Swiss-Prot record:
Keywords, ordered alphabetically: Cell wall, Cell wall biogenesis/degradation, Disulfide bond, Glycoprotein, GPI-anchor, Lipoprotein, Membrane, Secreted, Signal, Transferase
InterPro entries found in the cross-reference section: Glucanosyltransferase (IPR004886), Glycoside_hydrolase_SF (IPR017853), X8 (IPR012946)
Species name: Schizosaccharomyces pombe (strain 972 / ATCC 24843) (Fission yeast)
Protein name: 1,3-beta-glucanosyltransferase gas1
Compartments, record wording: Secreted, Cell wall; Membrane
Residues that hold (1,3-beta-D-glucosyl)n 1 according to the record: 88, 156, 290
Residues where (1,3-beta-D-glucosyl)n 2 binds: 157, 198, 203
One Gene Ontology molecular-function label: 1,3-beta-glucanosyltransferase activity
Taxonomic classification: Eukaryota, Fungi, Dikarya, Ascomycota, Taphrinomycotina
Length: 542
């Protein structure tokens, strides 16, 4: 009889909570539910294989666009005791409501990367452009309205070793601008973070680089794709103790944004016991097991064929591990002394050469203004494949500092470094024409009647200076990256970055929201109870 009463109680609580999921926010170095209970991720990577797509020429499959598929997978997530998924690429133009609702009803939160395979900050030739900013904000717009949207990832393993640390400045600029966009758009303060590889030389300086500086610039959380624990390892020999000690001074939440070594099969996921133990939870807030779908890399825990799902050997191990761990309950109201902290940016060294001066916020209005006032421009029939030869020739003859983007310390960013390739080529061709009086380039360019710069456009050009190496301070509304924006009509509702510097430390509570505790006893009970049922952190006290 007691079991029957408990079953009814569970069903009632789950039914009551099904209609609403408590948004999760960041306060200092931890995630919290709205009621102040600490949140831990028991997650899994969720990105379908392109080979499984029915659409010819598909670059990636949006895992949040197929409501039937999401509903199909929810019971398996529940069997795994998963409370979060990570998706790596979404199509912002598609409808995500069915999937997000299915996951919300199941108490599952979503962590989404902002990039996609062919729209991302490059490791080898990093830039932060109008087009990339537009892509990232479109993803924000498509997912931010949902209460179970846990956070956005501005880059995944962009910095791979000490040879391309310059790329970090561009990722951090993306973090800054997406955070500003979320705020100016009136969304709740959804965290924006970065996910890195576990590279020995850059591991420490990279983490502190993304954590340091002004609240507006640094990440809200930091993830490491970590595969150090293989087979039946332990807290010490796996390297987990070292990693935990290394990051004990981080001021933002730390997660394993991927984990699950496959060197020993089957994977028993014994690292989960350590990750959610008191040895690690002071620093770490859970993680994302890699991965749900089986693929050629053999990390999956299920195979999918149409509506049919078959669990693989690793599935029950992951399920039992997640179900068995319940971290010690902790609350925002009792942790206030540990939440406020600052992180000053460190000096560069041979392992870390990223500039603390960040690229400016991309502005389409500035680019259109500049381009409309050029007299010597590239012909429309010239293929973009031929642009590189023209850039090479012109930039060997005159300075191209106005379009330069260099994230190596101390950082150098031309006024038009974020414009598209055609606009940048128009700029340097016109500069060459002004210096040498030639605008032919073997028939590739032509003279046109340039527009006169007036009003706001004139102020942009003046701020850039004759060499176009000055930062252009501007304000822009939340549609500053829209393809329909214009320099003459741009409104002024938020301040954009203009080659900002991260030289000073600051509080890391930019993404926090004040918690007033539980709004009622019943809501607090439901959220706390569900956190145990679906993989959260608290223990239900009655």
């Amino acid at each position: 009889m007691k079991f029957s009463i408990l079953s009814l109680a569970v069903a009632g609580l789950v039914g009551l909570a099904k209609a609403s999921v408590s948004p999760v926010h960041v306060d200092g170095r931890y995630f919290f539910y709205e009621n102040g209970t600490r949140f831990f991720l028991k997650g899994i990577a969720y990105q379908p294989n392109v080979d499984d797509s029915d659409t010819e020429g598909t670059l990636f499959v949006d895992p949040l666009s197929d409501g039937d598929a999401c509903s199909r997978d929810v019971p398996y997530f529940q069997e795994l005791s998963v409370n979060a998924i990570r998706v790596y690429a979404v199509n912002a133009s598609l409808d995500h409501s069915a999937c997000m609702q299915a996951f919300q009803d199941a108490g599952i939160y979503v962590l989404s990367d902002l990039a996609q395979p062919y729209e991302a900050i490059s490791s080898s030739d990093p830039t932060w452009t109008v087009d990339l900013f537009s892509r990232y904000t479109e993803v924000v717009d498509s997912l931010a309205p949902y209460d179970n949207m846990l956070g956005f990832i501005a880059g995944n393993e962009v910095i791979q070793n000490n040879t391309n640390t310059n790329a970090a400045a561009f990722v951090k600029a993306a973090v800054r601008d997406v955070k500003s966009y979320i705020k100016s758009s009136g969304y709740r303060q959804i965290p924006v973070g970065y996910s890195t590889n576990d590279e020995e030389v850059t591991r420490d300086p990279m983490a502190y680089y993304f954590d340091c500086g002004d609240d507006d610039d640094h990440v809200d959380f930091y993830g490491i794709n970590i595969y150090e624990w293989c087979g039946d390892s332990d807290f010490v020999s796996s390297g987990y103790q070292e990693r935990t000690e290394e990051f004990s001074n981080m001021t933002v939440p730390m997660i394993f944004s991927e984990f699950g070594c496959i060197e020993v099969r089957p994977r028993t996921f014994s690292e989960i016991v350590a990750l959610f133990s008191d040895n690690m939870t002071d620093v770490w807030s859970g993680g994302i097991a890699y991965q749900y779908f089986e693929s050629e890399n053999e990390y999956g825990v299920v195979t999918v064929s149409g509506d049919s799902v078959s669990t693989l050997t690793d599935f029950p191990y992951l399920s039992s591990r997640y179900a068995s761990v319940i971290p010690s309950a902790s609350y925002e109201s009792t942790m206030s002394a540990t939440l406020t902290a600052t992180m000053s940016c460190q000096a560069t060294n041979s392992a870390w050469m990223a500039a603390t001066s960040l690229p400016p916020t991309p502005s389409e209005a500035v680019c259109e203004c500049m381009d409309s006032t050029r007299s010597c421009v590239i012909n429309d029939d010239v293929s973009s494949d031929d642009y590189s030869d023209l850039f090479s020739y012109v930039c060997n003859e005159i300075s191209c500092d106005g379009i330069t983007a260099n994230g190596t310390y101390p950082g150098q960013y031309g006024s038009y470094s974020y414009c598209d390739a055609k606009q940048q080529l128009d700029y340097v061709l016109d500069a060459y024409y002004s210096a040498k009086g030639d605008c032919d380039f073997s028939g590739s360019a032509t003279l046109v009647s340039a527009s006169s710069a007036t009003g706001t456009c004139a102020s942009y050009l003046s701020a850039a200076g004759s060499s176009a190496t000055n930062a252009i301070s501007l304000t822009a509304d939340s549609n500053a990256v829209s393809r329909n924006s214009s320099a003459s009509t741009m409104s002024t509702s938020y301040t954009s970055g203009s080659g900002s510097s991260n030289s000073s430390g600051s509080s890391s509570n930019s993404s926090s929201k004040s918690s007033s505790g539980a709004s009622s006893y019943n809501l607090n009970m439901v959220i706390t109870f569900l956190s145990v049922v679906i993989g959260g952190t608290a223990v239900l006290f009655i």
